[in-house]
Curated annotation (Swiss-Prot):
GO terms for molecular function: 1-deoxy-D-xylulose-5-phosphate reductoisomerase activity; manganese ion binding; NADPH binding. This is 1-deoxy-D-xylulose 5-phosphate reductoisomerase. One of its GO terms (biological process) is isopentenyl diphosphate biosynthetic process, methylerythritol 4-phosphate pathway involved in terpenoid biosynthetic process. The keyword Cell membrane does not apply. Its EC number is 1.1.1.267. The gene is dxr. It catalyses: 2-C-methyl-D-erythritol 4-phosphate + NADP(+) = 1-deoxy-D-xylulose 5-phosphate + NADPH + H(+). It comes from Xanthomonas campestris pv. campestris (strain B100).
Length: 396
């Protein structure tokens, strides 16, 4: 991108933590980046505040009942921003000339449709929505390839692999990729010690500032399991070439090992603004607001194997990847229901993997040929997990 061109960015999920980081980077470069579309699920007041600050051309609220509040709020603020509501409006804007880049940061399966719409329209897609790849990875990558869309991952691990692979013309010489995990707030605890974990403890991540659902996924290691499935789709690697290491300092974000024995790693402070700056400006580099890494001050880098006995969600993700078809969609849907129940205090922490495993073993995988097949599997998995919530033995 030349210095004189202006990249118009749609930030889907603008009121979340990733959206805030994206808007921080965009605001630092008004000469080359503009937030042209902002969306939120139901936080209409927060969306209005962002519109006042960033003055996008369009604002979308997913909850159609809040459309009058958004429309009137924009008018009262004296903004020319056009108000929209509902998923269809989001999809239409993703595919329109209102943007050339989409930050896909809507949490959960709700973000899939707009992500696919952006890919089908050939946009640069900064992908933070893990579920799009886990639920429909083959469909998304195929759609993007056909339309010439560019998928740039912005979670730290896949961004690290992206940067390592793009640093040289050696993608065919990859022996394996190694995703790093912080281990979450409960690293080192035995399984029995996890029974009394509370939602407040689970969302208190030691390194990253994230939303509640992703924080719980990090605590269970499901986040890393989903990233294994993502890496399979993003980089075209079989599961056997994707490993996981626990790295509590969260400074080495991932590594790529080549067949000649060389290993490249990407390091940096744990701040999403770095990876967002990579995606927004690639192949150029721009200031992100994140400081450099002082290895002398950090002192040490530690690595250890993940404990899949205490944290079985990582193993369940490997199982789903090996099974293929709709199994990853089933895994993801069951996990969303289980995590929601945990955050509401309905079940304990250990019930999350128990519920996911129950649904994975109960439902038969199908070939993931169409989006309808995947969405049906998603809905069926949610129903199965909801029914299992009433089963006392799963509430460990």
């Amino acid at each position: 991108m030349s210095g004189s061109s202006l990249r118009r960015v749609a930030v889907f999920g603008a009121t979340g933590s990733i959206g805030a980081s994206a808007l921080d980077v965009i605001a630092r470069h008004p000469e080359r980046l503009r937030a042209s579309v902002l969306s939120a699920g139901s936080k209409v007041d927060a969306l209005l505040a962002l519109c006042v600050q960033h003055r996008p051309a369009h604002a979308v609220i997913a909850d159609a009942a809040l459309y009058p509040t958004l429309r009137d709020g924009l008018h009262d603020a004296g903004l020319t921003t056009q108000a929209h509501a509902g998923d269809q409006a989001l999809d239409a804007l993703a595919a329109s000339d209102a943007c050339d880049t989409v930050v896909a940061a809507i949490v959960g399966a709700a973000g899939l449709s707009s992500t696919l719409a952006a890919a089908a329209a050939g946009k640069r897609l900064l992908l933070a929505n893990k579920e799009s790849l886990v639920l429909a990875g083959e469909l998304l990558t195929r759609t993007a390839a056909a339309a010439g869309a560019e998928i740039i991952p912005i979670d730290s691990e896949h961004s690290a692999i992206f940067q390592c692979l793009r640093s040289c013309d050696a993608s065919r010489g990859v022996r394996r990729v190694i995703l790093t995990a912080s281990g979450g707030p409960f690293r080192g605890r035995q399984r029995a010690q996890l029974a009394e974990v509370t939602p407040a403890q689970a969302v208190a991540h030691p390194k990253w500032s994230m939303g509640p659902k992703i924080s719980v996924d990090s605590a269970t290691l499901m986040n890393k399991g989903l990233e294994v499935i993502e890496a399979h789709h993003l980089f075209g690697l079989p599961g056997e070439q994707i490993d996981v290491l626990v790295h509590p300092q969260s400074l080495v974000h991932s590594l790529v090992e080549f067949v000649d024995g060389s290993t490249l790693a990407q390091l940096g402070l744990p701040d999403m603004r770095t990876t967002l700056a990579v995606g927004l400006a690639w192949p150029e580099r721009v200031e992100s607001g994140v400081g450099g890494l002082d290895l002398l001050q950090q002192g040490r880098l530690d690595f250890e194997a993940p404990d899949t006995g205490a944290f079985p969600c990582l193993r369940l993700a490997w199982d789903a990847l090996r099974a293929g078809g709709t199994a990853p969609a089933i895994l993801n849907a069951a996990n969303e229901v289980a995590v929601s129940a945990f955050l509401q205090g309905k079940v304990g922490f250990l019930a999350i993997p128990a519920l996911v495993e129950h649904t994975l073993t109960t439902l038969q995988r199908q070939n993931a040929d169409t989006l309808n097949t995947l969405l049906f599997a998603d809905a069926e998995a949610r129903r199965t997990t909801e029914r299992a919530l009433a089963h006392h033995s799963l509430h460990a």
